[in-house]
Regions:
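A glycine- and small-aliphatic-rich helix-loop capping segment at beta-alpha/alpha-beta transitions
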Residues: 23-28, 203-212, 232-240
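Short acidic, glycine/serine/threonine-rich loops at helix termini
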Residues: 18, 59-61, 74, 227-234
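Conserved phosphate/anionic-ligand binding catalytic regions in large, soluble enzymes, centered on
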Residues: 7-22, 188-211
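Acidic, glycine-rich active-site loops and adjacent beta-strand->loop/helix elements
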Residues: 11, 39-40, 53, 192-194, ...
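General beta-strand structural signal in soluble alpha/beta enzymes
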Residues: 7, 186-190, 216-219, 254
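Mobile "lid/hinge" segments at catalytic clefts and subdomain interfaces of large enzymes
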Residues: 212-285
Length: 285
């Protein structure tokens, strides 16, 4: 029997939600930390991996923290993306299910989204190892070729590099389509670039580590409303997510929830890794 990884995205999908789910499923944290530490990224950042209680369940929390006013803070800052209307989100259950001979369940995650401002009601443990980079910021932003070079220069396996490059390509093509430019001219700027690079690399490392045979996404659940970003006020789904869904045939279900549940990086992960949109009739869990 093959090992199929099933993502139940009842509360959407983002990069850090995906990494946390994969760690809870059994991806090796030591391998993830060591491999991320070899990425030649100039900007300082910290990786926080901790256990948190959500809906009375013990779950993994994965955060990329970037410096702000002398402190390392959650990267979801107002200067990147903010909701038009302030509200709290508790995203429950992006469950990653590995259907095969061996299986772990991952339930109820309440995670921040890549490059978006969400008010989270949870705290983070600081008693864990942090991965740092200690040089100056990369002010001009990075293009896809430069980011591919970062992956290539790391100790990521060939399989993980291939996954990361597929995710990056999907994201870059969507951004190029949104802005009416060539993929080679797309740049990911400032903090959002670091966050996206880490989330993409971490997802690829964990997926490769789990060694699954296929990935199932039946549907992505999305909210409604607007988000305020560097380009102004955008509708939900944001244009990059819409482009990814259209280009790759992703199925969406819209919920009566205000706010963004599917981020561009999350949609790119789904589009780049999906092998089926249908669950098998019977399976071992």
């Amino acid at each position: 029997m093959s090992r199929q990884l099933y993502f139940e995205c009842a509360s959407g999908i983002s990069g850090d939600m995906t990494v946390a789910a994969l760690l809870d499923l059994g991806a090796d944290e030591k391998t993830l930390r060591e491999t991320l530490g070899t990425l030649p990224i100039e900007e300082p950042y910290e990786i926080h991996i901790s256990r948190v209680k959500k809906s009375s369940l013990d779950v993994c929390d994965f955060l990329v923290k970037l410096p702000q006013d002398g402190e390392f803070l959650d990267h979801d800052m107002e200067y990147l993306h903010g909701h038009l209307h302030e509200h709290d989100h508790e995203h429950e259950s992006e469950a990653a299910h590995d259907h095969g001979h061996d299986h772990d369940h991952d339930h109820d995650h309440d995670h921040s989204h890549d490059r978006h401002d969400h008010d989270h009601g949870h705290t983070h443990s600081h008693g864990h190892e942090h991965d740092h980079s200690h040089t100056h910021a990369h002010a001009h932003g990075r293009g896809p070729d430069e980011i591919r070079g970062i992956f290539a220069a790391s100790s990521m396996t060939d399989g993980a590099k291939a996954i990361a490059n597929r995710i990056l390509q999907v994201l870059a093509e969507a951004e190029a389509a949104v802005h009416g430019t060539d993929v080679s001219l797309v740049h990911f700027h400032e903090a959002g670039a670091v966050d996206s690079i880490i989330d993409i690399a971490a997802t690829a490392i964990c997926l490769d580590n789990l060694a699954v045979d296929g990935v199932i996404f039946t549907e992505l659940c999305e909210g409604h409303g607007s988000v305020r970003c560097q380009h102004g006020l955008l509708p939900i789904p944001v244009p990059a997510v819409t482009k990814i869904a259209t280009a790759h045939g992703l199925k969406f279900r819209f919920l009566p929830v205000e706010g963004e549940l599917v981020t561009p990086t999350g949609a790119a992960i789904a589009a780049a890794t999906i092998t089926s949109d249908t669950l098998p009739a019977a399976m071992k869990i």
